Amino acid sequence: MNPVIFLVDMNAFFISCEMTRNSKLIGIPAAVAGNPQNRTGIVLAANYEARRFGVKTAMTLNNALKLCPTMTVVPPDHRFYRQKSSEVMNLLSKYTPIIEQSSIDEAWLDMTGTENLFGKPADAAKLIMEDIKENLGLWCSIGISEGKFLSKMASDMKKPLGITELWKRDIQTKLWPLSIKSMHGVGAKTYEKLHSLGIETIGDFANLKKDDAHQILGKFGLDLYHHAHGIDTTPVQVISPDDMKSIGRSTTLPEDLVDIEQLKYILLTLCEDIGRSARKHNKRGRTVNLTLKSSDFKVIHRQVTIKATFNTMEIYEAGYHLLKLHLNPKIPIRLIGVSISGFEDTSVPEQISIFNMDEFNKRDTIGNNRNEKIDMVMDSIRNKYGSDKISRASLIIK
């Protein structure tokens, strides 16, 4: 039996979530962004009406409003988006128990062997899409193939509300004519390198000798070569939320960034989510890990040990310090991630920090119970009145 893998990609997720509770946003340019009142922050999501004006995710709000002055802007409500994401995943579990959530708005489904239940793959995808639209008020695109890579490529081919099948037998006619720039995993730096060698399409890369692909891009080149030939045996992996060895968040940027002001805003947004999750599960971690993936797909992981904490600002300050140390202003960043691990039993007395950076250790946030009380108050207000009722001034980009 051949595998059947779906990639369900929620379209313009954050702003689509907002549209489910505010119908006035439907049909007009709208976006979720940092601070609508002060016209500061960055665009986290824009609907398709706004995108027609050139508005893109990660663009500064000020620039976005220059492109589309009539755009309606709403502040982010991450708790609400997590709730809607959970609703999506619960709905998807009706169709298969084998689900790998890759981000808040994407998941792979192993639909192998479900044809007797839901019909052919395209029919099953239509059922899922209509189920999500009718019951949750959200839009999605679904890619279908034998593997995760091709299903991901397929999901990008038709948005919004698209269903695309991309089987191995079709790669020469459907995949190979596409620009190498559109290949999942190829960033700006990689594209520049391949373009300089006359490699313009995925087919051009697929027709290289395997050794040449390796020589040009190293191990990453071999991965791309296999993917260009439809070879991907990576299984869909079910990750249990109960097996919590770490709490992390990451985001792939739609545009490569080098501006530390934009990156630190995104970092703090991720840390807000991590901190709230850690407090919800009463998990204090001692290791903060920062992940940066550059536009040429080199990945660095840097970590530091601090006093056990679930305080948002302590996690953020550790991550930001690592970001300042390891961000190269000449190398654009494609992905940024942060996590906390090394959880300790809250009944165990806190240990002395071995975070050996004198300047950092002098910061007021480290070991400051006042910040934990602030977190608790903010969590309480958000849980009772909504995430948009209170925000940190630190989340504003001036």
From Swiss-Prot:
It is an enzyme of class 2 (transferase). Binds 2 magnesium ions per subunit. Keywords: Cytoplasm, DNA damage, DNA repair, DNA replication, DNA-binding, DNA-directed DNA polymerase, Magnesium, Metal-binding, Mutator protein, Nucleotidyltransferase, Transferase. Residues 5-187 form the UmuC domain. One of its GO terms (biological process) is DNA-templated DNA replication. Gene3D superfamilies: 3.30.70.270, 3.40.1170.60, 5' to 3' exonuclease, C-terminal subdomain (1.10.150.20), DNA polymerase, Y-family, little finger domain (3.30.1490.100). Belongs to the DNA polymerase type-Y family. Monomer. Poorly processive, error-prone DNA polymerase involved in untargeted mutagenesis. Copies undamaged DNA at stalled replication forks, which arise in vivo from mismatched or misaligned primer ends. These misaligned primers can be extended by PolIV. Exhibits no 3'-5' exonuclease (proofreading) activity. May be involved in translesional synthesis, in conjunction with the beta clamp from PolIII. This is DNA polymerase IV. It comes from Alkaliphilus oremlandii (strain OhILAs). The lineage of its organism: Bacteria, Bacillati, Bacillota, Clostridia, Peptostreptococcales. The gene is dinB.
